[in-house]
Curated annotation (Swiss-Prot):
InterPro entries associated with the record: ANKH (IPR009887)
GO terms, biological process: ATP export; bone mineralization; calcium ion homeostasis; cementum mineralization; diphosphate metabolic process; gene expression; inhibition of non-skeletal tissue mineralization; locomotory behavior
Keyword field: Cell membrane, Deafness, Disease variant, Membrane, Transmembrane, Transmembrane helix, Transport
Organism: Homo sapiens
Keyword Cytoplasm in annotation: no
Pfam families to which the protein is assigned, alphabetical: ANKH (PF07260)
Classification lineage: Eukaryota, Metazoa, Chordata, Craniata, Vertebrata
Gene name as annotated: ANKH
Assigned protein family: Belongs to the ANKH family.
GO cellular component: extracellular region; membrane; outer membrane; plasma membrane
Name under which the protein is recorded: Mineralization regulator ANKH
């Protein structure tokens, strides 16, 4: 068997990240399978794709913050009591999300948000609100799955997490194929992707919960001991979670904002509906080569030996911060290569759209330029993920909050300014998203530098204090020092 000693320190990182990367890519494939379920409907396919895209992107705004409870499970859940608190938080959050879904579906608020703000016609608006109502229970199921995924990641069960997500996608693809041959294609085509989404989530949630009970539940204590900092309080969990939730909420609301501005820019015409449909089709395809880089932020908390919660998990790896940095750089280079191969090689991106989503060639050609813009996303995404993971390890997530605000400001500014430069449609949307990513990553880098300087100053002060104390207590008398020097001279 061939061995690579230079890679010894990186195998744990590879084994940990690869399943998570596959998970992220699998989610994108799942989205494409759902889009194919709509595109296969011959009548009003573009209108249905736009309606589902609007509803799905709004729903992602509610589920986004909950998926970051994975990081709470990764960092804070050290006992059964901690896990109960995390699950309780997610039950409440899921109920609140369901209430908002219902309000948007039935109230004037939903009519204003979807019909008026997006300038879509009555048909698209009513289909979007109906789809949003059907998706009301999904945030709760998604939250339960992600909470247990974080606990499994803490114990290095990333392979199980990856298998759960792949099972989710397989279930979605299977149910799309089954439902396309049912009466739903004629009576309620929107239910084809939505029911498939629910079945996939049910499979994923069940797999993760069973994995937790089989592998972890019996080995963790009922309560956390003092060596792990004691039981985590709900307040600590929420203080850690809210900046991450705010960031992910702004990431998820970015898509609805883009859809809104792109649609309004084109005046709610058929071109606007087509542009939103292009964005719906290109998001998962463009996200696929770089989306997995987001999972890099789980690496620092999982492998950093200064994190007290890692004492619970027995490990013999020798991964250092330097190894993590080099590994992160290689991941970014790999992602950039994938992006340029997929989106800049002639006819490759069109073939992906035609074969996977099932759109026609004319529609696929309209997606080429937006997809090429996605090629530049890996750099800001990698910077953000790497530094966020480091700050999560230090439990200093509060400094990340301003980055989400800057992202939205840059995004909206780009959506307003670029049309004056002749940029419209899906190209306007994806270009503005890139500008928002760059702005957010820049602010995260500034926040990380601020924390690093504070940490360095704190360590220098502690070292100086310890040096003074040791000088006062450990210094032998002057006569003893003289005797020691004389003895050394005699021996020489």
């Amino acid at each position: 068997m061939v061995k690579f000693p230079a890679l010894t320190h990186y195998w744990p990182l590879i084994r940990f990240l690869v399943p998570l990367g596959i998970t992220n890519i699998a989610i994108d494939f799942g989205e494409q399978a759902l889009n194919r379920g709509i595109a296969a409907v011959k009548e009003d396919a573009v209108e249905m794709l736009a309606s589902y895209g609007l509803a799905y992107s709004l729903m992602k705004f509610f589920t986004g913050p909950m998926s970051d409870f994975k990081n709470v499970g990764l960092v804070f859940v050290n006992s059964k009591r901690d896990r109960t608190k995390a699950v309780l938080c997610m039950v409440v959050a899921g109920a609140i999300a369901a209430v908002f879904h219902t309000l948007i579906a039935y109230s004037d608020l939903g009519y204003y948000i979807i019909n008026k703000l997006h300038h879509v016609d009555e048909s698209v608006g009513s289909k979007t609100r109906r789809a949003f109502l059907y998706l009301a229970a999904f945030p709760f199921m998604d939250a339960m799955a992600w909470t247990h995924a974080g606990i499994l990641l803490k114990h290095k069960y990333s392979f199980l997490v990856g298998c759960a997500s792949i099972s989710d996608v397989i279930a979605q693809v299977v149910f799309v194929a089954i439902l396309l041959h049912s009466h739903l294609e004629c009576r309620e085509p929107l239910l084809i992707p939505i029911l498939s989404l629910y079945m996939g989530a049910l499979v994923r949630c069940t797999t993760l919960c069973l994995g937790y009970y089989k592998n972890i539940h019996d080995i963790i204590p009922d309560r956390s001991g003092p060596e792990l900092g004691g039981d985590a309080t709900i307040r600590k969990m929420l203080s850690f979670w809210w900046p991450l939730a705010l960031i992910l909420a702004t990431q998820r609301i970015s898509r609805p904002i883009v859809n809104l501005f792109v649609s309004r820019d084109l005046g709610g015409s058929s071109a606007a509906t087509e542009a939103v449909a292009i964005l719906t089709a290109t998001y998962p395809v463009g996200h696929m080569p770089y989306g997995w880089l987001t999972e890099i932020r789980a690496v620092y908390p999982a492998f950093d030996k200064n994190n007290p919660s890692n004492k619970l998990v027995s490990t013999s790896n020798t991964v250092t911060a330097a190894h993590i940095k080099k590994f992160t750089f290689v991941c970014m280079a790999l992602s950039l290569t994938l992006c340029f191969v997929m989106f800049w090689t002639p006819n490759v991106s069109e073939k992906i759209l035609i074969d996977i989503i099932g759109v026609d060639f004319a529609f696929a050609e309209l997606c080429v330029v937006p997809l090429r813009i996605f090629s530049f996303f890996p750099v800001p995404v990698t910077v953000r993920a790497h530094l966020t993971g480091w700050l999560m390890t230090l439990k200093k997530t509060f400094v990340l909050a301003p980055s989400s605000v800057l992202r939205i400001i840059v995004l909206i500014a780009s959506l307003v300014v670029l049309p004056y430069l002749g940029v419209h449609g899906a190209t306007l949307g994806v270009g503005s998203l890139l500008a928002g990513f760059v702005g957010e990553s820049t602010m995260v880098a500034i926040a990380a530098c601020y924390v690093y300087r504070k940490q360095k100053k704190k360590m220098e002060n502690e070292s100086a204090t310890e040096g003074e104390d040791s000088a006062m207590t450990d210094m032998p008398p002057t006569e003893e020092v003289t005797d020691i020097v004389e003895m050394r001279e005699e021996n020489e």
